[in-house]
Regions:
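Bacterial N-terminal signal peptides
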Residues: 12-23
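Amphipathic alpha-helical coiled-coil segments
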Residues: 51-66, 154, 158-179, 188, ...
Length: 452
């Protein structure tokens, strides 16, 4: 029996499955877009934005619902009746226009035979004055406008999130590039250590230290590569797309203005406009509660057909025209409580608006300080990187000349790796801070030159 062949055959199938599954994940489709293409796709496909669009459309339909209370109502009704009730029986025959002399016989009046009636009616009612309907229409228009402003703010948020994701992707790509440099340099250090050991100029322990340093650099590269993939997948999720999304260009550089310009722009931020409308609607809600004190005036009319034998029959027909006034003189103090409640709600909305404006002002101030901090830290990290590069170069020269031990070179390399990572992070923080300030002031679409 060929045990070797059997072992290979047993291993072959699992290895094929592993290879197919592995390549399926490794070569999953990756979309490649420009930054502006990514923003455009996000504005079209993002699920949160689609939900907000549906909410805005639903609010717009609410205007039609409110307007319908001011329009005429037309009602068609077909009703069947069979009765021996004396009053109903007599009036039904009267509606059918078939009253005869014997129907006035007391015995017939008191004990009528069963009467059938198919009643067909078409009625119309038109409000002439309805205070609640008028105020409700104004409020529904305001609510629709507020939802539209919220939708535009949501678009700004999505654009901001795409810019954030793009900057994050750029940062982790730079970090991955730095780890690749670190691996290449660690490989070179190991080569030098092995050469020196082979020539009897170094110790075997130096090669072990260099190999350990290489392993650590490779681990950092693996983590950095994972971060790149996660950033791409996160961007794909934000864009509402399957798989990873990579960008083939950089995020546009946003201009940095004076803080006064950002504070001025924030006064017309979309969510501020929305809350201003909500606050105005809350005040109108007081008028809506007070509308209960006003009468409801309307006119109406109806055309009716009655037949003892068939639906839609017209053995007897009649019409009527009405004008009416309905006035709730007392409703158990319900209107008073509704009015008081509406006043408190209006005060709540006004306080929410004031809080939002102050919060925005604080965030703009904070974001501006963060920019100054990030810019200073970026400059410091750039100088630190230059120092680390020069320091490592000098240590390597001295190590190759036998003046420094390997541990000094590895320490210098570790400092350089840290300086690279720190500078990459500080650059990302600076650009992220500018994008955040643009978003907080409500001008990110303008800065990115994107039409809402």
């Amino acid at each position: 029996m060929n045990l070797k062949g059997l072992s290979l055959s047993r291993l072959f199938f699992p290895l094929c499955i592993f290879f197919l599954l592995g390549t399926g994940y490794a070569f999953a489709e990756e979309h490649n877009l420009s930054f502006y293409e990514a923003v455009r796709v996000a504005l079209q496909n993002n699920h949160e934005l689609k939900a907000m669009q549906n909410a805005a459309l639903a609010s717009k339909e609410g205007v039609g619902i409110a307007r319908s209370y001011l329009l005429p109502k037309v009602i068609f009704e077909e009703r069947y009746l069979r009765t021996v009730n004396p009053g109903y029986a007599f009036m039904t025959k009267l509606d059918q226009q078939r009253i005869e002399q014997q129907d006035f016989n007391p015995l017939t009046l008191n004990h009528p035979d069963p009467v059938n009636n198919f009643q067909t009616s078409l009625a119309i009612e038109q409000p002439i004055f309805t205070r609640k309907g008028l105020v409700g229409l104004q409020m529904s228009k305001g609510e629709s406008s507020a939802k539209q402003e919220e939708l535009l703010r949501k678009q700004e948020q999505i654009a901001y999130q795409v810019a954030q994701a793009a900057l994050t992707l750029q940062t982790v790509k730079s970090s991955f590039g730095a780890t690749e440099k670190a691996v290449a340099e660690a490989v070179e250090h190991l080569r030098i250590a092995e050469v020196r050991y082979g020539k009897g100029m170094g110790q075997y322990a130096d090669t072990l230290r260099a190999a350990t340093s290489l392993s650590e650099a490779e681990q950092r590269r693996v983590s950095a590569e994972k971060n790149v993939r996660m950033a791409k997948r996160g961007l794909g999720l934000l864009l509402g797309m399957e798989g990873n999304v990579d960008l083939n260009d950089a995020t546009p550089e946003l201009p940095l203005l004076d803080m006064a310009a950002y504070e001025k722009a924030a006064e017309t931020r979309r969510d501020v406009k929305s809350w201003e409308i909500h606050s105005d609607n809350a005040k109108k809600n007081i008028k809506l509660a007070e509308a209960g004190y006003f009468p409801y005036i309307g006119v109406g009319g109806a055309y009716q057909m009655n037949d003892p034998n068939r639906p839609l029959g017209s053995e007897g027909s009649n019409w009527q025209v009405t004008a009416f006034l309905r006035w709730d003189l007392f409703d158990g103090t319900k209107r008073e409580y509704e009015r008081a409640q509406a006043k408190y709600k209006a005060g709540e909305a006004q306080e929410q608006l004031s809080s939002l404006k102050k919060t925005i002002s604080f965030r703009i101030y904070e974001s501006y300080l963060n920019i100054n901090e990030a810019r200073t830290n970026m400059e410091i990290s750039r100088n630190a990187l230059k120092s680390a590069e020069e320091g490592k170069r000098l240590v390597r020269v001295r190590y190759e000349n036998g003046l420094y031990p390997l541990i000094d070179l590895l320490n210098a390399q570790a400092s350089l790796d840290q300086a690279r990572a720190n500078h990459t992070a500080r650059e990302g923080e600076y650009r992220m801070a500018i994008v955040k300030l643009s978003y907080e002031s409500g001008i990110i679409m303008k800065d990115l030159k994107i039409e809402p």
